[in-house]
C-alpha cells in the first residue's frame, strides 16, 4: 500500500538539508501512513485508480443499503448479489437493480425506479467492485502527517525529557474527550477524514 507522503516531501516542508535522520524518517513515513489509514478507517489513496472488491454479509431481511469502506466514492464497476453461499453471483444493473449514492458512499438495492428492495441475505451475499479515495493525499491531511512525523521524530509524546542538564516538559494531556494520544491539532484534521462504521 502507498505511503501518504514521502521522505523528500517531509524534508522539503521542514527545510531539512542533512541526511542524518533519513533512516528514521523513512520508518516514520511508512509507520505513520499506516497509523493514519488505520485511524481514519480508510486507505485514502490506495483505491483511487485501482479496483477494490468488497463483500457484505447481510443478515437482516430489511437491509436495503450497504456503506462502502473506502471514501469518497469515485466509481462503481459492478454490483453482484447471490441468494446463498453455494450460488454464483448475479450481476445487477445500475439504476434498475441498484442506486449509487456518491454523497454518502453507499449503494441502495432498488426495485425499478421508485422503491427500495432488500438485499439477499447470507454470508458474502453482496459483492461490489469500486474505486474510491483521493488521487493524492489532501494538503490539510498531509500537514497533519508532517506534524505527526515531527511528533514522533522529536519524541514529543514523552512527557519529560532531560538533555545536558536541562529538562523539557511536554504537555501530554489533551482537551479532547476519549483521547487516543494525538495532539489536539492533529486529531482534529484526522477526524475530518475518519470513516465511522455504521454497522
What is each of the regions a protein language model found here?
Residues 1-199:
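Divalent metal-cofactor coordination and adjacent catalytic microenvironments
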Amino acid at each position: 500500500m502507498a505511503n501518504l507522503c514521502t521522505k523528500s516531501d517531509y524534508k522539503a516542508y521542514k527545510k531539512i538539508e542533512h541526511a542524518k535522520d533519513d533512516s528514521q524518517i523513512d520508518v516514520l513515513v511508512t509507520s505513520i501512513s499506516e497509523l493514519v489509514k488505520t485511524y481514519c478507517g480508510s486507505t485514502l489513496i490506495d483505491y483511487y485508480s485501482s479496483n477494490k472488491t468488497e463483500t457484505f454479509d447481510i443478515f437482516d431481511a430489511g437491509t436495503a443499503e450497504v456503506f462502502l469502506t473506502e471514501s469518497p466514492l469515485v466509481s462503481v464497476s459492478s454490483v453482484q448479489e447471490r441468494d446463498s453461499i453455494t450460488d454464483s453471483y448475479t450481476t445487477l444493473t445500475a439504476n434498475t437493480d441498484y442506486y449509487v449514492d456518491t454523497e454518502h458512499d453507499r449503494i441502495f438495492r432498488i426495485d425499478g425506479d421508485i422503491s427500495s428492495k432488500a438485499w439477499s441475505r447470507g454470508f458474502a451475499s453482496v459483492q461490489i467492485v469500486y474505486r474510491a479515495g483521493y488521487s493524492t493525499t489532501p494538503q490539510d491531511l498531509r500537514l497533519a502527517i508532517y506534524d505527526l512525523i515531527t511528533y514522533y521524530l522529536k519524541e514529543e509524546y514523552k512527557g519529560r525529557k532531560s538533555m545536558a542538564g536541562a529538562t523539557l516538559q511536554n504537555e501530554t494531556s489533551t482537551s479532547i474527550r476519549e483521547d487516543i494520544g494525538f495532539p489536539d491539532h492533529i486529531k482534529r484534521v484526522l477526524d475530518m477524514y475518519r470513516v465511522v462504521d455504521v454497522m
